[in-house]
Amino acid sequence: MNKDIATPIRTKEILKKYGFSFKKSLGQNFLIDTNILDRIVDHAEVTDETGVIEIGPGIGALTEQLAKRAKKVTAFEIDQRLLPILNDTLSPYDNVTIIHQDVLKADVGKVIEENFADCKEVMVVANLPYYVTTPIIMKLLEENLPLKGIVVMLQKEVADRMAAIPSSKEYNSLSIAVQYYTEAKTVMVVPKTVFVPQPNVDSAVIKLTVRETPAVSVENDEFFFQLIRASFGQRRKTLMNNLMNNLPDGKQHKAIIEEALQTADIDGKRRGESLSIEEFARLSNVLQKALF
């Protein structure tokens, strides 16, 4: 039986064997604690009927734990230097496929279709590189992929934002974007000491359960997100000020914006971070009708 990859000794051995040096630009921090990996897989509720997409497998620490429980694992790895290492470390598992590609440029829908046709459900489970966390998650959500959910390790601060509630310090446009598509919950905080090299920040694992239909009904989701970004433009400004300053031709549409706020029963003196997703949806539908 092979020793688990995610132990300090085995990780050190593997890195030494291949003369691997970390690339800061790729946000490479490898986990060296199998208990934490097991808990991540538990939170993802992976079974022998699950197809798993992993992003940034590193030397295969999480991949290995997923492969033990999932029907199939397909992992995207951008760093060519890791391919021979993964080939070696994951050789005992015949249910793993490695794709050498940047996931942001990949047709993930096609990969799901081709690799997971015989799986009952598809999950994304990953220890994400911190510098591209948000673009990766938003890509997965916006592409309306047939996912049951996403369980990922990321910077704690970003996890806090994704799961934040209105009027909290962390609540922003990312909170609403993520909660529009999913139910978000931070399930674990992970200290920096369980990584090599140690990151500068603490991490957290967030579980995003994909909703069957979005949290709110909006006429035009592109305008809905534009309105949200505008509302959070300058945090200390009122909603009315932010909308005038940040929506295209906002100042010219002052009267229309004022009337829309009134119709939606929202006080323009409030700040964007005090509005719930339902209030944003109401305002978006009224304002979109008035402007277009």
From Swiss-Prot:
Binding residues annotated for S-adenosyl-L-methionine, in chain numbering: N29, L31, G56, E77, D102, N127
Gene Ontology terms: cellular component: cytosol
Primary subcellular site in the record, as a coarse category: cytoplasm
Top-level taxon in the UniProt lineage: Bacteria
GO molecular function: 16S rRNA (adenine(1518)-N(6)/adenine(1519)-N(6))-dimethyltransferase activity; RNA binding
InterPro entries assigned: KsgA/Erm (IPR001737), rRNA_Ade_diMease-like_C (IPR023165), rRNA_Ade_Mease_Trfase_CS (IPR020596), rRNA_Ade_methylase_Trfase_N (IPR020598), rRNA_adenine_dimethylase (IPR011530), SAM-dependent_MTases_sf (IPR029063)
Keywords for the protein's UniProt record, in alphabetical order: Cytoplasm, Methyltransferase, RNA-binding, rRNA processing, S-adenosyl-L-methionine, Transferase
Function: Specifically dimethylates two adjacent adenosines (A1518 and A1519) in the loop of a conserved hairpin near the 3'-end of 16S rRNA in the 30S particle. May play a critical role in biogenesis of 30S subunits.
Name by which UniProt lists this protein: Ribosomal RNA small subunit methyltransferase A
Originating organism: Bacillus pumilus (strain SAFR-032)
